[in-house]
Amino acid sequence: PQEEALSYLDAISSHCDYKKDSKDIVEAAASEYCEKQRKVKAGFDFPSFCYAMATGIGKTRLMGASIYYLYKTKGYKHFFILAPGNTIYEKLRKESNPNHPKYIFKGLEAEMGKPKVYDGENYDTYPIKYDQMSLIVEKTSDIQLFIFNIGKIFNSKTDTQFNFHKFKETLGASFADVLAQFDDLVICMDEAHRYYAPASMKAINYLKPVLGLEFTATPKSTSNVIYAYDLARGAVEGYLK
């Protein structure tokens, strides 16, 4: 199923340029080349595609494969990975370490090198500089992953903004402003149905990614699903017990 899922991203990506094309053009390509031709429409300000995959099929592996694909075919190097809570956040942090047995890019090390990982604990060490008060983000040859836990950085009861939208003295800017500088930022949302509250969507839209990839077994809406693989099919085909 992961290979099949990736084939739809490939078909869509081959017919549009996420950096240059408008959201409407990208969604028109997605509507034509998704699994079951349908009108694809994302709720965010940017094009965002959902993989509706049953739990246990390997969404994290698919995320790693999608990142590799966009790096290899489009040259994108900046990937923002959002986790819905501490358990998944810690799991993603561990699995982004090449020494972990379930390394997210297992088997792709020779092609990808070692991606630099920034997360909720070390993001204020990100290297930036200023030129006449303008924020300059250094060009990088490495893939950079930014792994954040929405529960940790955003508290809807007390906070109207993500913590990384706040000014950081060490950076001289907010980390959201740093992320918004990248012209190739892709946002990967694990358990994507958790991010559709208005405040979360506003904070995510602020980052201006070129593309969103959503991974969930229970999509908030089916309007942007490009590939679906449910429990029943997984059981029949032997991927789930």
Locations of the language-model features?
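RecA-like P-loop NTPase motor core of helicase/translocase proteins
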Residues: 1-241
